[in-house]
């Protein structure tokens, strides 16, 4: 990273006594207690720059205060107060956390879901327990629609990457898709449909989600965020024996669905909540975008006209999906970019691209009746002619129409709040625990498909306009799509991106700059 110190970096401080919070695991000793080993030096502990970005442990003073308001002790204290005031408890949990906790307790994911719901109901009195899939589906659909307009192309539900852009790489902000994360939209779905006072606890794989819940546009959607590492501290040994004792017992889909149905709000989708979609264990945004574009371009009579090819990058954390026509030409690309090293490469490549090259173009294809049907596609960032692009080309971030970025190597399944080892026996030392969790994620959580948003009824004069697909001969098509989005969603699902240089400085002695006004903090 650059050693240069910029003026805007000086408007906050890190307290001197704050040490790195990155946990360091130690290998068990084979010696007897009290026995000294001569001639061996202890191994030096190394924490890489990649760890630091994913961890965001070196937090500012304001972020330290915010984080202190989001932990398991705060949840216990606040919920004990709120329930006496007539509040109901709702809990949302990310699928990565369900996988991590199920492996920690040594049971299958479906069995864990059943026992976890029972634990929350009997111990904490939870009224509703939901997954975040419905919120994720709304997030994916909206991100696809924003990306279709061609101005923004970087998608990230990762608060670590978002804060990195806002603090250090403001030049990337115009490319970020301004849609809220699945956690935040789940908060909207829970609270907007409920008439009672609700306390919302969310269990997330990443500590940075705590800061995300305190963003100005998200305050009130999630009342407290904890991670699996903090959740297990709430569970007593007696409760482990009662609810989470290691077992090979499995349950069927009907029993699993029955458990979910009892705790799903009537205004949310029972069939979706605890499932997941195709793609990666981080949400599959890049994969879903390429499916979305294939749907737009495919004829009902010829669904096999386009195929999707997966191309690996130089390391496991870069994957590109390519939509290819029958002649082998690449039409659309979407790319997964995980980990700090790849983010640095992305930053260097995208930083040099001039804004004038962010254009849109129209690709025409014949329809079944022989007429031309124009579909608007996002151009590659360097506006190259995709007709001349060959399938054999290596992965190139600058040619991608859609980028899914996560700070952690391996993505959200490797979030810092997830548990790495089981309650009794950890995974094989020679295996990659993140890869193990990824395999469990993709094979154990029931899958659901995301229906394309194409069924809105339009006036006959606009019959050739579909949400996210713009006909070139309609001058007011952008207005139509904007009105459709605002009619269905308003602006509540939009993300506000903050550039520190545009935020007014905090003046000494100004008592108004408190936690209750987070926009005044230099956190964002």
From Swiss-Prot:
Keywords on record: 4Fe-4S, Iron, Iron-sulfur, Metal-binding
InterPro entries, per database record: Cytosolic_Fe-S_CAF (IPR050340), Fe_hydrogenase (IPR009016), Fe_hydrogenase_lsu_C (IPR004108)
An individual GO BP term: iron-sulfur cluster assembly
Low complexity bias: start-end ranges: 369-388
Disulfide linkage: none
Region of interest (Disordered), residue spans: 362-388, 501-524
Keyword Nucleotide-binding carried by entry: no
Keyword Iron tagged: yes
Residues that, per the record, bind [4Fe-4S] cluster 1: 20, 52, 55, 58
Matching Pfam families: Fe_hyd_lg_C (PF02906)
One Gene Ontology term, aspect cellular component: cytosol
Residues where [4Fe-4S] cluster 2 binds: 158, 206, 408, 412
Highest taxon in the source lineage: Eukaryota
Alphabetized GO MF terms: 4 iron, 4 sulfur cluster binding; iron-sulfur cluster binding; metal ion binding
Annotated TM spans: none
Stated role: Component of the cytosolic Fe/S protein assembly machinery. Required for maturation of extramitochondrial Fe/S proteins. May play a role in the transfer of pre-assembled Fe/S clusters to target apoproteins.
Protein family (similarity comment): Belongs to the NARF family.
Name of this protein: Cytosolic Fe-S cluster assembly factor NAR1
Organism: Vanderwaltozyma polyspora (strain ATCC 22028 / DSM 70294 / BCRC 21397 / CBS 2163 / NBRC 10782 / NRRL Y-8283 / UCD 57-17)
């Amino acid at each position: 990273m650059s050693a240069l110190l910029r003026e805007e970096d000086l408007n906050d401080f890190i307290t001197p006594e704050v040490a790195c919070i990155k946990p360091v695991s130690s290998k068990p000793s084979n010696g007897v207690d009290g026995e000294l080993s001569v001639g061996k030096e202890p191994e030096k502990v190394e924490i890489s720059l990649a760890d630091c970005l994913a961890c965001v442990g070196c937090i500012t003073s304001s972020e330290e205060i915010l984080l202190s308001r989001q932990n398991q002790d705060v949840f216990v204290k606040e919920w004990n107060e709120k329930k006496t005031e007539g509040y109901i408890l709702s809990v949302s949990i990310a699928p990565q956390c369900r996988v991590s906790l199920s492996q920690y307790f040594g049971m299958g994911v479906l069995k864990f879901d059943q026992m976890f719901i029972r634990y929350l109901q009997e111990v904490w009195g939870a009224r509703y327990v939901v997954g975040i899939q419905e919120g994720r589906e709304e997030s994916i659909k909206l991100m696809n629609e924003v990306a279709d307009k061609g101005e923004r192309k970087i998608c990230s539900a990762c608060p670590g990457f978002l804060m990195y852009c806002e603090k250090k790489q403001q030049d990337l902000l115009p490319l970020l898709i301004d849609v809220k994360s699945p956690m935040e939209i789940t908060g909207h779905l829970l609270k907007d449909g409920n008439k009672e006072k609700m306390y919302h606890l969310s269990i997330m794989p990443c500590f940075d989600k705590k800061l995300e819940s305190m963003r100005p546009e998200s305050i009130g959607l999630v009342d407290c965020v904890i991670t699996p590492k903090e959740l297990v501290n709430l569970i007593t040994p007696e409760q482990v024996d009662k609810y989470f004792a290691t077992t090979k017992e499995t349950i069927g889909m009907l029993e699993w669905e029955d458990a979910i149905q009892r705790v799903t709000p009537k205004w949310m989708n029972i069939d979706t909540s605890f499932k997941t979609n195709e793609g990666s264990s981080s949400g599959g945004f890049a994969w879903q975008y390429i499916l979305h574009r294939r749907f737009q371009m495919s004829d009902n009579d010829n669904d096999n006209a386009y195929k999707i090819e997966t191309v690996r990058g130089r390391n496991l954390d870069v994957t590109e999906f390519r939509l290819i026509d029958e002649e082998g030409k690449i039409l659309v690309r979407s790319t997964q970019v995980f980990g700090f090293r790849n983010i640095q490469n992305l930053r260097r490549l995208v930083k040099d691209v001039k804004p004038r090259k962010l254009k849109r173009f129209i690709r025409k294809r014949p329809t079944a009746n022989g007429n031309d049907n124009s579909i608007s596609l996002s151009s590659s960032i360097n506006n190259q002619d995709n007709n001349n692009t060959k399938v054999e080309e290596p992965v190139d971030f600058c040619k991608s129409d859609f980028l899914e970025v996560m700070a952690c190597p391996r993505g959200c399944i490797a979030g810092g709040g997830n548990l790495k080892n089981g309650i009794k026996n950890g995974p094989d030392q020679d295996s990659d625990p993140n890869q193990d969790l990824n395999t469990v994620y993709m094979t154990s959580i029931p899958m659901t498909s995301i229906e394309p948003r194409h069924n809105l009824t339009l006036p006959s004069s606009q019959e050739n306009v579909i949400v996210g697909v713009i006909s070139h001969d309609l001058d007011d098509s952008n207005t139509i799509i904007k009105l459709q989005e605002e009619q269905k969603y308003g602006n509540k699902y939009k993300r506000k991106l903050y550039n520190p240089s545009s935020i007014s400085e905090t003046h000494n002695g100004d008592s108004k700059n408190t936690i209750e006004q987070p926009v005044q903090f230099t956190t964002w």
